[in-house]
């Protein structure tokens, strides 16, 4: 029998091959990456970490483990910014991993003042 192929579908999510081929990333973390990528492209909705945690059938511990793995492997950046005396957090899902800090602290002007590797 000839090798089979998947039928193409409409309404699909495009994911960089980098993470799918990264042998250092667990399937759990790859799955979370894919889910996040699929949802953040939806218009008219701001997604939070908690929104994605609620989608995790495996529970908080498994979600936290995959989230941590994405941060530590460089696929997920956390930006913590001062906003009129309050802290605001934004998450950035990267197509390719970046070395260095995964959590960046910004002042009111948007300048990075410290990170998870070097606190000011």
Identify the residue ranges that each predicted region occupies.
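Short, intrinsically disordered low-complexity segments
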Residues: 6, 85-87, 96, 118
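Charged low-complexity intrinsically disordered patches
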Residues: 93-120
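Winged helix-turn-helix DNA-binding recognition segment
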Residues: 18-30, 36-91
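Short amphipathic alpha-helical segments and their helix-coil junctions
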Residues: 10-19
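N-terminal leader segment of winged-helix/HTH proteins
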Residues: 1-10
